[in-house]
Each structure stands twice: as structure tokens, then as C-alpha cells.
Amino acid sequence: MVRHPQHQILGVMTDFTLSAATVAPAIIQWQRVHGRNQLPWQNSRDPYRVWLSEIMLQQTQVATVLPYYDKFLEAFPNVQSLAQASLDEVLAHWAGLGYYSRARNLHACARTVMEQWSGQFPDSSQALESLPGIGRSTAAAIAAFCFGERAAILDGNVRRVFCRFFEIEGDPGLGSTQKALWQVAQHALPDTDQIASEPDSMQRYTQGLMDLGATICTRSRPDCKSCPIKPGCRALATGRVASLPNPRARRSRPERATHLLLLVRQGRVLLARRPDKGIWASMWSLPASDSKEALLQTWSSLLMHAESPLQKMAAFTHDLTHFRMLLNPWRVELPQSFDLSWFETNLDADYAWVDQDTIAKYGVPAPILPLVEASLSR
């Protein structure tokens, strides 16, 4: 049994002996009986499948991920097929999951594995962390699930569990709090004796921590009575479960207006590729400007040929991490006789005319897709 001295963590004295001696065994035993054991990526040591699930689950709930995971595997059953696909194909299959930088990193990572690792994922968390889009916690999860490595994870659910169990103060997103959480995460791992006697202990422990945070130690209304580690939970003992982790200081979310041009011609809609940096990078969306005036100026020579005046559609909002988008769509129809060579002459960005048969091939952001599909169905 590995014993750890007492450490000072943000002013809170925490006995790591308790974590090493009781937390890991309790979580492992609980996970065997009460944890989530029927998810499609479980019971697999295939790094590709585990990696895909870990990336999809970042900031996204399991129920949302499940249908996307199966469809993504149908399209890209292995790292080779993903690496050989175009970014457009990957974004099209990712559309709707949000946080699209994950899809771009996924594609880049697959190509790196093929080019630099001979098509095989590296078998250590340190090497995995060097790949595009794989951070410390994700690398540890893959290494634990696939290779049984004794590596600590610290996703959002696990941070909440440790903040409460060890009564750690501070915003979990701050560097000082993160450092403390990584320290306890490392010391709470199963000891080497347990790993030697139970070959699946790292897989069970890692999954158990995730399950505990997702189903028991939830953000609101946690089920403390069912928690396998409640005897040692400092927040439960002091009545502070509801106040930990400390909430982040609320910041006002600025609103940014964007004006969209829904250009329709014979039941087809014009899409333009977004820049390769910024919001919805490299995806296909409606042409956009920061103001109506800028939109009109850019498209003035085209709009004079429209069959009807520019039609204002209902505005709507879409929340992103740091700001709220106020989206103002404007619809206009072009006659069949309009010379399409205008687009080659006047547009700098890539563009495409899509219809009901081709829209699925393009990665269109979730807030924009209903606008496009509604016009295609007319």
C-alpha cells in the first residue's frame, strides 16, 4: 500500500492516505455493479474507438454523442479511412455536435498517426498528448482504457468530484486550482498492488470516476446517498456540496450581430466556405456580413437581378462560449436566367450550390442548417 503524507492544498489539509486507501477501491467496486457498462466504445481496447469517443464526449453529453458515434464509425471505421477522407467529409459527419475545432483536430490527428506512427496510436499518455487535439486528460483516458496505464484523468465531471471530496476551493478553470486538482487526481489512483491483482482496475477506476460525476455527483441535485465514497467526502461532512466547485464569476456575454444572405435559385441554395480560422472555421454556411449595409454593398450587383426584393426573415440567437450571435437572415431568389459566372468573377471564397440530394455532403453549422433545408424543401 502506497502512503502519502499530508499536503497543503489551497489552505485545505487533505489526507492523501485516505484517497489511496479507500477512494479507488470503492469506485472500482461501485463501477462494476452500478456504472455505465453498455456504451458502444466500452469493452474495447481499440485506441481508435476509444479516442473517438473521448473527443466526442468533450463538453457533450453521452446521449447526444451516441447517434453521432455510430454514424461516424460507419463512415470512418478506422484511423486510415479517417485520414484519407477530406476535411469536408469529416465536418459533414460532425455537423450538429458543435465545437467544430474537435473535428478539425480529429482529422489532423488521424493523418499524424498515419504519417508519423505507421497507423498505430502510441501506447503511452505522454506520446498520445503530443498528437493534435489530445490534451493531458484525454491522453490519460486513452492510455488507461487501452493500455492499462496508471494515468490520472481530470475532465469536468472528475473535477467536480474531487473539488467536493477534498473540499478544494477556487475556480476549477484557474491554473492554481487545476494544479491542486491534478495533484489529488494523481494520488487518488489505484495503487500498484491493486492494479497487479485486478488487471482491469485502471479501466474500471477511470470509467468509474466519469460515471460518478455524470450520474451521482452531478452539478445540481447530487445523489449523495448513493455515492460510494461519501464516507470520506469533506464537502458532505461540512454541508458544502451545493457550493462546490466554486462557481465561476459570471461575465456578461456580448452580443454580435451577423447578417446572412439566403440566396435561392431553382430550389438550390448558395453556400460559401467559412475562413479557416474563427467561428465555424472551414465549414459551409450562408454568406455573411457584420451589417445589412455591408451585405448589400457586397452583393449589390447581384441583387439588382433578383426576382423579388430582399426579404427579411425572423432573427434568432445562437450562444457560443464567449458571446451570443444575433443572426439576421435575408432571403432573395434569383431567376433561372441569371448568369452563374457572376460568382466565379465576384466571390473570393469557395462556394457551392446545394440541393436536397447534396446538402448532406457539406458540413453546415447546426444553427444554419434549418434555414437551408427549409428553402430546399419549397
Question: Predicted segments — roles?
Answer:
Residues 15-19, 25-223, 229-242, 304:
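Catalytic cores of DNA base-excision repair glycosylases
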